[in-house]
């Protein structure tokens, strides 16, 4: 293995993860995750598989997997996935109706001043409920809010300044708490504002989309876009907690629902083959918003994300593998225009391109290529980039990707059986060129 290659292996858990039936959850098997191998060669990080060393899910006697989500659940036992970062660890709460339980949110509010950052689509639906949850029985807390325009094209410095304007005009001090109420764009912008305002204030994530609930709200990546590339300006800044109220998905547009599934599918491809097999059996249930299926997918995705972040918070190696399809996908978003495609749509097409390149390199079996294409089509996601994307556009945009090191473009590619991937710059450039020519104009 080359020195600039990181390999992530998957060990299949027990083979009896049955297909989802009705509204009863299938109890999940043990999940196996990678750790750094003691046998690594000098200059090489080799990752092998081991069982998850500590439980990241704290729930009541009955796990969320084993019961219908629409049952009334006690607030004393929500499903909790822990992001283990030492003294900066925080919980991800998962369940239905969590915004109705003010004590769960209030325990993570610091100080008496709160700024809720949301957008003009989410505000009419959940802003009042969130303010009520923050202030109910707690008259000493005052809440300000700033409502931003919705969409990826507004994830920029001009829009970010509106958050700072509101915070400064409201004279918020260092003991205030910022609350991100919305999808990935709001979470990224609010988190970056919290990281920057007065050199850092507390913040809470309340994600309202599948995309944000399974991926962007977890792990502390915050930031904004630049006209030359996506997420080029930002910081790693962890929240106090992530509160996933699955009831917020009831108002999510179908296109946004499908977009979020691209990130769910990603986890199965790079590190959790058994989860991918479950997805193949249950993708229609997820699209239909079956509450039990969604709860399982969200929990399992968060477990995977939390484990990776706990091992590699600042994306020095392992965490980069979570970007399968994102290098191609970010190029699509930048080249086609921010907001023209949803993030998950671009990632889906980018994933197909990464899988195609992996196959051209001889690293995966053709059956994996077919399975990836099939599940993305069933998920109502695109499998090719927009026709306007050209080879030169891909190359020029990918040249400024965050994963470029010393002028070398490093990619996340599949290698070996399903559930295995590498983060590497050691690949035949002709395979990349062939993939770009196959999916875009010369």
Swiss-Prot record:
Q: Where is the transit peptide?
A: 1-58
What superkingdom heads the lineage?
Answer: Eukaryota
GO cellular-component terms in the record?
A: chloroplast; chloroplast stroma; endosome; Golgi apparatus; trans-Golgi network
Enzyme Commission number: 4.2.3.4
Q: In which pathway does it act?
A: Metabolic intermediate biosynthesis; chorismate biosynthesis; chorismate from D-erythrose 4-phosphate and phosphoenolpyruvate: step 2/7
Indicate where this protein resides in the cell: Plastid, Chloroplast
- Example GO biological process: amino acid biosynthetic process
User: Mostly located where?
Assistant: plastid
- Can you state which reaction this protein catalyses? 7-phospho-2-dehydro-3-deoxy-D-arabino-heptonate = 3-dehydroquinate + phosphate
Family note: Belongs to the sugar phosphate cyclases superfamily. Dehydroquinate synthase family.
Q: What is this protein called?
A: 3-dehydroquinate synthase, chloroplastic
In its UniProt entry, the species of origin is given as Arabidopsis thaliana (Mouse-ear cress)
Gene behind the chain: DHQS
